[in-house]
Amino acid sequence: KVIGGGPMMGRALVNTEVPVAKGSSGLLLLNRKESTRRPMRDCIRCGKCVGVCPMGLNPAFIMRDTVAKNWDSCEKMNVADCIECGSCSFTCPADRPLLDHIRIGKQTVMGIMRSRKQ
């Protein structure tokens, strides 16, 4: 697996034909064992994701509402303020893909907000 942008904020590359440019912050190469996700478990409500969020968001609740497609609640919880640092996912002892869901919620909510302005 090849990740462009580093271990925390990087994104998996679909193929290796993506060019590396001056602004590229790095490439991370993972073997099969390192790139396999551990199975996700139920949230244990430890609050570690909230404690590490530099924006003061509640990643666990945002993920819950993204899964439920409750976009109004995601907007009220300021999902658009997420800087996508990945600290929440990295810290989660239940191995929940918090950032993946937050990115979906953020993209959807920002689309809704743009359509309101038009």
Feature locations, PLM:
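Redox cofactor-anchoring modules in respiratory/redox and cofactor-processing assemblies
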Residues: K1-A94, L99-Q118
